[in-house]
Amino acid sequence: MALSLEEFVHSLDLRTLPRVLEIQAGIYLEGSIYEMFGNECCFSTGEVIKITGLKVKKIIAEICEQIEGCESLQPFELPMNFPGLFKIVADKTPYLTMEEITRTIHIGPSRLGHPCFYHQKDIKLENLIIKQGEQIMLNSVEEIDGEIMVSCAVARNHQTHSFNLPLSQEGEFYECEDERIYTLKEIVEWKIPKNRTRTVNLTDFSNKWDSTNPFPKDFYGTLILKPVYEIQGVMKFRKDIIRILPSLDVEVKDITDSYDANWFLQLLSTEDLFEMTSKEFPIVTEVIEAPEGNHLPQSILQPGKTIVIHKKYQASRILASEIRSNFPKRHFLIPTSYKGKFKRRPREFPTAYDLEIAKSEKEPLHVVATKAFHSPHDKLSSVSVGDQFLVHQSETTEVLCEGIKKVVNVLACEKILKKSYEAALLPLYMEGGFVEVIHDKKQYPISELCKQFRLPFNVKVSVRDLSIEEDVLAATPGLQLEEDITDSYLLISDFANPTECWEIPVGRLNMTVQLVSNFSRDAEPFLVRTLVEEITEEQYYMMRRYESSASHPPPRPPKHPSVEETKLTLLTLAEERTVDLPKSPKRHHVDITKKLHPNQAGLDSKVLIGSQNDLVDEEKERSNRGATAIAETFKNEKHQK
């Protein structure tokens, strides 16, 4: 039966792709125009198309609420790279079968591919009863004993109970509320049900975006996102991917069951390649669509180029950001094979609690205060701009607050005087400002830095990587090494030179290839070239969020004690926080000349000025009142001497 293209798309189950369509009634345009704005617009009756995908071409956004001072706002296109963050509003329209859910919602192995629903009534299974309103997580769609089933799970008392539901399972299934925050790209790829709109709340917007903000000023409200789709496919005798708008006025017939799809190009995306088993590599492929903005030699990934894909694997990268006061900051993924060398640069700490996290057993943390703090209690130390401290460990101490004894968490330090040291207790709730004093002049390769020091860590390239033509890291004023992450890569080479290989990231490099043949392995070793990859703000945000979610975040810094709190509550809170804080070695008193470098005993103004120069080198643009005050302090000290 012939359908309009729009009707076909509406009824399409994405799990059944690819599909083969025959044009029943074509559309013709005068002249020789076969493509407009990147989309096919001319087909002849009888032509056959293999549909390989349905992608969102653009998003139309509509503001739901009336904005004071604004006229009625028309729907507008929201760019795919819009750097906003959104919270999803649960769809109030129920799904009536599990089959309807799987046909319209993305379910997959990704972190984002596990949607949650609840049912209006109890669901009685063989060994389990799913209660009314209980959250059901959908994990995957699998074939079990010849029947397609949805693998589900419920969580009860910190235990997960798994079960399967058939596609025929009926009832009213509603989306659960979702408290997570998403980028527009994540919503487009995973969270917009097919044939439905998606209501979201805008929660944040990056002011680093250099395009015009499409929203009214200070808008943080509710939007309806409407996807505009495009069909992707291939045709016989053509070596490119065609794109068709569903609104194209043609009639089609699905002939998948009666047509040999092998007549068409067998196209694979980077994600498809990574899903292949390791035993299927190496393979020879032809590049059909090349990635945009790739940093590999231009001759390798060009349409029509034959390449070898040797293997897939996970590789380690160091996520780093440029240190600078103005935006936008640049972000990089640095391979551990990077051959340049780094020197340490001073870190900045906004609170005493940050000092507690940053201290290490390897060496004493030496800092200079950039902000004054007046202690309200005799037992706790006040801080002046320019004061220097050696940080030891966290403790608890009792203070009197309006006659009531209260326990507070403190950081035990030693204040550095001209020729001696003085014990100091800094409350962890102290919102001060500190800059690290660096005495280590050694040059480190990145692998040694990550082994010896705790991230995040500030560095500057001191010796560029001479094995690459242009070292982008060498031009940066300074870098903060933030996290060690693991990412997915394919190892590829030019077919004409299979021993010189390059790593390409699966998630950030979109490429389409045609499978040509298998490749016979040679015993000859690979020369693997890894590149420093510059990533976008959105990619950086997603990496930080996902990597950080894998480990428990550190406890929040203790709050300033309030008089209204009871003694019991304070003691309990102090005990809890003391347990949560990282353990550190006991404070010990050492001779002054052994605490620091031999030539730095006494800490005259030269050391401090040297530290200040490090900061100036790292960020010349900065105009920091605290740093200026330190410089004045150093100047006065020198004058007095």
From Swiss-Prot:
Keywords: Adaptive immunity, Cytoplasm, Developmental protein, Immunity, Nucleus, Phosphoprotein. Residues 260-518 are annotated as: CABIT 2. Phosphorylated on Tyr residues quickly after TCR stimulation. Residues 1-259 are annotated as: CABIT 1. GO terms for biological process: adaptive immune response; negative T cell selection; positive T cell selection; T cell receptor signaling pathway. InterPro entries: CABIT_dom, THEMIS. Residues 614-641 are annotated as: Disordered. It comes from the Eukaryota. It is found in: Cytoplasm; Nucleus. The modification Phosphoserine is found at S584. GO terms for cellular component: cell-cell junction; COP9 signalosome; cytoplasm; nucleus. Plays a central role in late thymocyte development by controlling both positive and negative T-cell selection. Required to sustain and/or integrate signals required for proper lineage commitment and maturation of T-cells. Regulates T-cell development through T-cell antigen receptor (TCR) signaling and in particular through the regulation of calcium influx and phosphorylation of Erk. Belongs to the themis family. Interacts with PLCG1, ITK, GRB2, and LAT. This is Protein THEMIS. It comes from Homo sapiens (Human).
